[in-house]
Curated annotation (Swiss-Prot):
Extracellular side: 45-592
CDD domains per UniProt: CHD (cd07302), PK_GC-A_B (cd14042)
Name recorded for this polypeptide: Receptor-type guanylate cyclase gcy-12
Keyword vocabulary terms for this entry: ATP-binding, Cell membrane, Cell projection, cGMP biosynthesis, Coiled coil, Glycoprotein, GTP-binding, Lyase, Magnesium, Membrane, Metal-binding, Nucleotide-binding, Receptor, Signal, Transmembrane, Transmembrane helix
Thermal properties of activity per the entry: Optimum temperature is 20-25 degrees Celsius. Loses activity at temperatures above 35 degrees Celsius.
Gene name of this polypeptide: gcy-12
GO biological process, any: negative regulation of multicellular organism growth
Length: 1679
């Protein structure tokens, strides 16, 4: 096995410095380092073909893509076609083992050995030298060839019918070897040649002769180009060496640098000289296009004695070159020698030039470093002979000075490879793995090489070109795409491609790669302070990427410089000039001497001669002025016109065709230079001198002829026209095959468009105004120099934004000759308005005759008739009916086009054929004017002045009031109607503003939020010792991995909701939650004392730990949740971070220490630091602390920490969410689509409110401005039980006034009876229910003894209406604070007076699906009660009762249930709402089942027997309430997946509210009793647990109605099984299945009975011992 380069280096280190060998091998040190890469055999005279036996393996097997023989093989049937790639490369060679070579050389001694031995020694030494003369890194990049072939062959979408193979030939850097190998590979069947590297001219010519492609990845020969026929099949992926100088010229041009000097070394004379010659040619080329020429001031060619330019002689030569040129140049250029660049920069810095206006630009064609730190350490600034810390740590080191000098340096390099690309990483790894195919073992520290990318791109471009040819020619067996080299190269050139380097490159039409280059400048970077890091760089500035050079749209021009985030940091803030202001020698600032006597004489003579010529000149100017005006006044510079390419149309009636937002063409190619292929017509809009103008194209089939003098006079006359009813002609643009007419833009379009728009209602005012404007304009044109229009038609009558008609498209008689149209139909259509004498029809061709003034009168008559009919000329565009006895077809149809041509021909042939006026309902004088205008005798037609006099009766009204006054009156009415709509939108805006403020106050502390709302900056603030809490979930990664994302989100939401409800009890601030981490602080932003805040955090931590012990993961109910808690006390800094989604965040070591306390803690324990322990011990509040001992804390060292085990005398009950008015910050989901909410038209958000509803809105607007306002709540009892909401904008259940209580108590008995009664059709109700899709029933609980007094009179300002009630989404808590503990069991609940009529919602527009009513989301206006109907009387309302209540978060909706009791001795029950076919809500029907949702592949499904058992209640219960089957009721059932049964899951949030409303537990039915469980449950047990919660005060908090398992009682957690309703059944099917079940309400008290049994259900028994409170009365609903 050949040794790797690292092994060779290690061997050399041991070998070279052994005694007796140092002198011999010192000069060969670098030889042996590179020789580690020389591994294969190569004879200088002959190169044998690769042997399949000697070929290294590809992974575990042989290389399947290396050709096994140079003999062609016939493909087998079914095999893929093989494409053989010839790979020619000069790989370094060395015969034998590298270590054996070194040993043999060491053992040789020229003084002791014979001449033959010395000759052998010399031969071996020459072989190593020959190895180094070739490119050593070629063998390193050759693996990219195999990587590309493997990837292409494995790509099923790229040339799937072909397989690539390659044959390799080692040219050894010899041209004759390369030519011979080329011929051998061609004879073996090679279809494409990749390579060779240096000289490829011969190979390119040979490939072109065989029409085979050759793609080079290294050849830089400037003489090879596809422009030459001999190299037509040549392309290369490596940019020519001189391509980078285009970027240099672009940089010079960017900063207006025109003069520069060049310094370069001639060590590699031919290469550097060729680069310089390329630069000279580029300067000469650019000077052809530049007014200010580029100039190379000096050229210094230096030759150095040492490669590292370390000798004093070399340094002196550079210094002399700078001193000799510094007086004539400011900009220096050097290239391809970084040592020269570094030395020049150092010398210029020592001479002080870098602090002046001097710049050094370095161009590096071979830059190949990975990042800025590598390039600083190894390439640009550091002396690589010294150690890193010697370079950068010493302030006076040469390397530190170099960094200061670099402010006056720039560098242009090939854009570095994007190493962060996963694609490149995979490619380079594969290329390294395949190196052994070419005799190289890849070293671990071998860095990437750009040549490998060029080699990969070459193979991939070839494969893509073959793929395009295969797709183009399909299955044509007669065509072999691999043999058509020119076609392959044609599909490679002139295209951009994505290089493996990570950016776009392009191969131009000459076959040369354009390259991609970047600019480096002195920039600020992040330092690397770790000295053990190979990239150690402790400085904060370096030469870093600043800009890239982007290819210009004109590909032959210089690239554009495109900067990144930062600009060049100039030394003086601006780029230095390339020469001083006064020149290098002050030649630009020399004082002018006194005029000589001769100069004075000459000036006098010139003045006299000027006076003599003045007379002649003035006369000549007068004569030429007219000619100049004649030829220029109509001409428009096309560069001043910017075409509008897009816009957002404003479709309001005030602006029918105007674009509110316009986009202009941004391309640098002039729009007018692209000759369109369409015919004559409107081009569109444009901007001309900041004004919108209209464009119209006149297209020609040839170049337009030059304008005659008469045509120019006509254009001048048109340009001088100025009249309100004549469209301003601005000029024309003469293009290659067209003439573009530029005119004033009219936003309303043409009269033809207005008349065709059926949505516009044109009254007499509009018609008279249009006709008057048209006549006035024609009178003005006929009186002008034009004398006639010549092309009058309704499409040329334009309407301005002020509804004024302007005549356009007049004149241009000569320009209209020979114009082209899109189709013949457009020609015939233009003649519809033309007089018969003004046209000639010859066969299928219609030609215009010279126009006359009388022809304009004819055209006016046709337009006049068109205005009144609005059906086009001759009623061509009428949609129905008959036109002149024939059925009129639809516009733009084939029949209509034929009818147009037929009509024009009939007008031309029949002098009496005119439009029919018999059905026009107009005055006789109008018809007389029409007939006179289109008289068959042109001389009998009236002039326009006569027409104006005859139409005076038509214009009588517009003389009193113009059209704009008429429109103003219409707009005033429209504005009045819009005021009500604005009021409504203002209310919504204020509501959304309130939501936004509440949202900000929930995201940030109130004090910080107030500062932000006030527009103030939040200044970071340092706090004295505060206490910080951290916690996270133990095993969260495992839980996340075994759960779905939705389950994880639901779990975290529930857990953090529990935490949030706890922390509200303490003076703390929740900082943030990141994943499973929870961070809380006390003392920020309001600081009190250190002891107080530590106590608050400690109590909160104990409380949270207590709550977590009783918490279960929703989807893993049998698995306990464990968390770690950490606490620490110390100072910190807090402030708002960021502008987008600002966060109030803590900073400091205290945060880190608190996090360490948590991460080093244990599950279900509180870990605190010694600082927190000291504070808690000092306050002596009974905290139980236990010393844990000394612990090694990361980043802190040894720390003594403590366990906080609790607080003496404190126990925490199950946590229920706090009672709190949560601001309604979340907008309703249908807010934008719901339309108006005040009884206006629901179908459009732009429709206007009615007069009645507008009064309500105005009162509401006034009420919204008041604070702390009581609001009226309206509800209505239903005959079948429950209450129907009559609407309110508040969010809380009602509370009663004292005056209302007695009236309600007297009639409470009717409430329970009404629940079981049948539903009666309400005939007294005038209105529907307030919200048909969101109705709810509720129980009005008895308020506390202290009640507010209801106002004696009704105040209009207290009215507020809402459109919808909003249901509770999943996971949201219902506020049940209105249930009072003392009143629930002891006090009576008032009922609604039974003399109030029921307002059963009237069923409207809905579809019934399985017993559900699907209502329209926008209610009709009749659903809202009248304002007067709701204000009749203080006690008994006309349609309901009014109660005042405070704001709550959400209103109850369908499925909510609350226990109620009529009196102390009466029966009790519950009111529960559900969906009904006749309304949105009604009393719960126990036989109803909810429709199941559609299934998904991952949902849990249960067996059919489980379904039946869960639904059939009677089959599950025994006489004592126990379960019959243990198999059906399980604590944690294992789901079984099945696809034929319904899914047991909630079909909607409504089902959860049905289930959650039950007092017997959320997830477990009240009959559930699992004998295998330790704890059993009965109906009374569930009731007992519910009332124990009420007694414990939990009713004053938010009830958690979404807990997964059942409630936890005193003896532990009761297991439960989730009962879910399902199925899609109609009401009849449910009755057949469930029999005659009815909603039964039973009640009992311990004083009346020991065991209560419902007579209708003998299976239900309730033991009296399970009642928790003797004073409590049980309320139960059975289904």
């Amino acid at each position: 096995m050949w040794p790797t380069s690292v092994e060779a280096l290690r061997f050399y280190h041991t070998f070279a410095f052994s005694p007796g060998r140092r002198r011999r091998l010192f000069g060969l040190s670098i030889v042996f380092v590179i020789a580690a890469l020389c591994v294969t055999s190569c004879d200088a005279d002959a190169v044998p073909a690769p042997s399949p036996e000697a070929e290294p393996s590809l992974g575990a097997g042989a290389n399947p893509y290396l050709l096994d023989s140079l003999v062609k093989r016939l493909p087998k049937k079914g095999d893929k076609k093989e494409i053989l790639i010839s790979y020619l490369a000069a790989v370094p060679t060395l015969m034998g083992e590298i270590d054996q070579y070194l040993l043999n050389l060491s053992a040789s001694n020229s003084a002791q050995n014979s001449s033959k031995d010395r000759e052998s020694f010399s031969k071996k030494l020459n072989q190593i030298v020959h190895c180094l003369t070739t490119d050593a890194y070629v063998s390193v990049v050759s693996g990219a060839l195999v990587a590309a072939i493997v990837e292409i062959n494995q790509d099923k979408d790229l040339i799937p019918a072909y397989q690539l193979k390659y044959v390799f030939g080692n040219t050894c850097g010899n041209d004759s070897h390369s030519t011979r190998l080329f011929m051998e590979h061609w004879q073996a069947g090679a279809r494409v040649f990749i390579g060779p590297e240096k000289n490829c001219k011969t190979e390119a010519a040979m490939a072109a002769s065989q029409n085979l492609p050759i793609i080079s990845y290294r050849c830089n020969d400037q003489d090879i180009s596809r422009d030459d026929y001999h190299y037509r099949t040549f392309a290369r992926t490596v940019p020519p060496a001189g391509e980078i100088f285009k970027a240099f010229m672009s940089l010079m041009k960017q900063y207006n640098w025109r003069k520069f000097s060049v310094v370069y070394d001639v060590k590699k004379g031919q290469v550097k000289n060729e680069l310089f010659e390329t630069l000279k040619r580029m300067v000469e080329t650019e000077n052809k296009f530049e007014e200010h020429k580029f100039e190379i001031m000096n050229v210094s060619k230096l030759e150095f004695s040492k490669m590292d330019i370390s000798s004093q002689q070399d340094i002196q030569s550079i210094e002399n070159a700078i001193k000799s040129t510094m007086q004539t140049t400011r900009i220096y250029l050097t290239f391809d020698n970084v040592r020269l660049f570094r030395t020049m920069l150092s010398i210029m810095g020592e001479m002080g030039l870098t602090q002046q206006d001097y710049m050094l630009i370095y161009v590096d064609t071979n830059y190949d470093w990975l990042n800025v730190y590598h390039s600083m350490n190894n390439h640009f600034l550091r002396n690589t002979m010294t150690y890193l810390h010697h370079s950068w740590d010493a302030n006076n080191s040469s390397d530190r000075k170099m960094l200061d000098y670099a402010r006056s340096a720039l560098s242009i390099i090939p854009t570095p490879v994007k190493l962060n690309s996963q694609r490149f990483y995979n490619f380079w790894k594969k290329a390294g793995d395949y190196m052994h195919h070419f005799g190289v073992q890849k070293a671990d520290n071998l860095k990437g090489n750009r040549i490998a990318c060029y080699l990969y791109d070459a193979v991939y471009l070839y494969a893509k070109a073959i793929h395009e040819l295969v797709e183009e020619y399909g299955n044509d067996d007669s065509y072999d795409p691999t043999a058509d080299g020119k076609a392959i190269i044609d599909r490679i050139v002139n295209k951009k491609y994505r290089s493996i380097q990570g950016f776009d490159m392009r191969i131009d039409e000459r076959g040369n790669s354009k390259g991609n280059f970047s600019l480096l400048s002195w920039q600020k970077v992040a330092p690397i302070m770790n000295k053990s890091d190979p990239s150690y760089y402790p400085l904060d500035h370096a030469l870093d990427l600043t800009a890239i050079f982007v290819e210009a749209p004109d590909k032959d021009r210089l690239p554009n410089l495109q900067f990144k985030s930062s600009r060049i940091q100039w030394l003086k803030g601006e780029p230095p000039p390339d020469e001083p202001v006064c020149g290098f020698h002050g030649e630009n600032c020399r004082k002018k001497g006194i005029f000589s006597y001769l100069t004075v004489v000459v000036m006098i003579l010139i003045a006299v001669f000027s006076l003599v010529l003045t007379g002649f000149t003035l006369n000549y100017i007068r004569s030429r002025r007219f000619e100049k005006e004649l030829s220029m006044i109509w001409k428009i510079d096309p560069y001043e016109v910017r075409r509008v390419v897009g816009g957002v149309n404003n479709e309001s009636t005030a602006s029918l065709m105007q674009s509110d937002v316009m986009q202009f063409a941004k391309t640098k190619t002039p729009w007018w230079s692209k000759a369109p292929v369409q015919g004559t017509g409107m081009r569109g809009l444009a901007s001309y001198k900041g004004t919108l103008v209209g464009l119209k194209d006149l297209m020609y089939g040839r170049k337009p002829k030059d304008l005659t003098r008469e045509a120019k006079k006509e254009l001048r006359a048109m340009r001088q026209l100025a009249h309100p009813n004549v469209n301003n002609f601005l000029g024309i643009i003469v293009c290659q095959y067209s003439v573009t007419v530029v005119r004033e833009y009219c936003s309303k379009g043409s009269l033809h468009d207005i008349l065709r728009n059926e949505n516009l209602k044109l009254d007499h005012m509009y018609v008279a105004s249009f006709v008057d404007d048209l006549v006035k304009g024609m009178v003005y044109i006929h009186d002008s120099e034009l004398k006639m229009h010549g092309n009058l038609k309704s499409t040329n009558c334009l309407i301005t934004s002020r509804w004024t008609l302007q005549i356009a498209d007049f004149g241009l008689r000569e320009l209209r000759e020979g114009i082209m149209y899109d189709s013949s139909y457009n020609i015939w259509e233009n003649f519809l308005w033309t007089a018969p004498e003004a046209m000639t029809i010859n066969g299928s061709l219609a030609i215009s005759n010279p126009p006359t003034p009388k022809a304009d009168a004819y055209s006016f008559g046709i337009i006049f008739h068109e205005i009144f009919t609005r059906e086009g000329p001759y009623k061509i565009y009428v949609q129905r009916g008959d036109v002149n006895g024939e059925a009129a077809p639809k516009k733009d149809s084939v029949e209509c086009r034929a009818l147009v041509e037929k009509t024009v021909r009939r007008v031309y042939s029949d002098p009496y054929f005119r439009p029919d006026t018999s059905d026009l309902e107009v005055q006789n004088y109008v018809k007389e004017v029409m007939a006179a205008c289109w008289h068959h005798d042109p001389y009998q037609r009236p002039e326009f002045k006569t027409i104006k006099n005859k139409l005076k009766p038509l214009f009588h009204q517009i003389y009193k009031q113009n059209i704009m006054d008429h429109m103003v009156l219409m707009m005033e009415k429209y504005q009045t109607q819009l005021e009500d709509l604005v009021d409504e939108r203002t209310i919504e805006l204020k509501d959304e503003q309130r939501r936004s403020q509440h949202l900000l106050q929930r995201m940030l502390p109130s004090s910080v939020a107030e500062q932000l709302l006030a527009g103030q900056d939040v200044i970071p603030e340092a706090f004295p010792p505060v206490t910080i809490y951290f916690s996270d979930i133990v095993g969260f990664t495992t839980i996340s991995g075994e759960s779905t994302p939705m389950e994880v989100v639901t779990f975290l939401n529930k857990l953090y909701t529990l935490f949030d409800s706890i922390i509200r009890r303490y003076d703390v601030y929740k900082v943030e939650t990141i994943g499973d981490a929870y961070m809380v602080v006390s003392g920020v932003p309001q600081y009190k004392t250190m002891e107080y805040h530590a106590e608050q955090i400690a109590m909160m931590a104990i409380h949270i730990l207590s709550a977590v012990r009783s918490f279960s993961i929703p989807h893993r109910s049998c698995e306990p949740l464990m968390i770690r808690i950490g606490m620490h006390t110390g100072p910190c800094v807090a402030g708002v971070v960021g502008k987008t989604m600002p966060r109030y965040t803590l900073f400091g070591d205290t945060v880190n220490t608190a996090s360490r306390m948590e991460s080093n803690g244990e599950a279900l324990r509180i870990h605190c630091s010694s600082s927190t322990q000291k504070v808690l011990t000092s306050i002596d509040q009974g905290f139980l602390l236990e010393e844990r001992g000394s612990l090694a804390i990361k980043g802190k060292g040894q720390m003594t920490t403590y366990w906080l085990n609790g607080r003496a005398g404190y126990e925490f009950t199950e946590t229920i969410e706090d009672k709190m008015v949560v601001p309604d910050i979340f907008p309703r989901p249908n807010l934008k689509n719901r339309g108006s909410s005040w009884g206006v038209n629901r179908e459009s958000s732009l429709s206007l409110a009615t007069e009645k509803s507008s009064q309500i809105m105005k009162r509401q607007s006034a009420a919204m401005n008041r604070n702390n306002q009581d609001v009226i709540y309206y509800n209505q009892p239903l005959n079948s039980g429950g209450f129907t909401s009559r609407g309110t904008s508040n969010r809380e259940m009602p509370k009663l006034y004292e005056e209302d209580r007695e009236s309600l108590l007297n009639q409470s008995a009717s409430l329970l009876g009404s629940r079981t009664s049948g539903r009666k059709k309400s005939t007294a109700s005038k209105y529907n229910g307030f919200s048909a899709s969101r109705m709810f029933s509720s129980t009005i609980s008895n308020a506390s003894s202290s009640r507010p007094s209801r106002p004696s009179t009704f105040d209009h300002d207290t009215l507020a209406l809402r459109k919808r009630s909003t249901s509770l989404p999943d996971g949201e808590k219902l506020n049940l604070e209105f249930i009072e503990t003392t009143n629930l069991a002891n006090n009576s609940v008032p009922a609604i007076p039974n003399n109030i009529s029921s307002l059963e919602p009237v069923f409207r527009k809905a579809s019934i699906i399985d017993g559900y009513s699907s209502q329209s989301e926008s209610p009709s206006q009749s659903q809202y009660p009248s304002y007067r109907d709701l204000t009749t009387g203080p006690h008994q309302r006309k349609r309901g009762i009014a109660t005042v209540f405070p704001v709550r978060k959400r209103s109850l909706s369908c499925g909510d249930a609350v226990p109620l009791k009529i009196n102390e001795n009466g029966a009790s029950g519950s009111i529960t709402t559900a969906v009904s076919p006749r309304s949105s809500c009604r009393a719960l029907d126990p036989t109803m089942k909810l429709a199941a949702r559609a299934s998904s592949p991952d949902e849990i499904i249960f067996q059919e027997d489980d379904e039946d058992a869960l639904i059939d209640n009677d089959s599950l219960l025994t006489s004592n309430g126990n379960s019959k089957s243990e198999d059906v009721l399980r604590t944690c059932p294992q789901p079984r997946r099945k696809n034929k049964h319904s899914f047991l899951r909630d079909p909607s949030p409504l089902a959860k509210r049905f289930r959650d409303a039950s007092p017997f537990g959320k997830k477990k039915p009240f009959w559930n009793s699992n004998k295998s469980n330790e704890h059993t449950s009965s109906p009374a047990d569930s009731i007992s647990r519910l009332f124990r919660r009420f007694r414990g005060g939990s009713v004053n908090e938010y009830a958690d109605l979404n807990h997964y398992c059942d409630d936890e009682d005193e003896s532990g957690r009761a297991n439960g099984y989730e009962m879910q309703e399902m199925g899609k059944m109609t009401g009849r099917q449910r009755e057949q299945r469930n029999g005659s079940r009815t909603n039964r309400s039973v009640s009992c008290s311990p004083d009346e009975c020991g065991t209560l049994t419902d007579s209708s259900d003998p299976h239900l028994t309730i033991p009296s011992s399970s009642i928790g409170d003797s004073s409590a009365s049980t309320s139960l609903s059975c289904s």
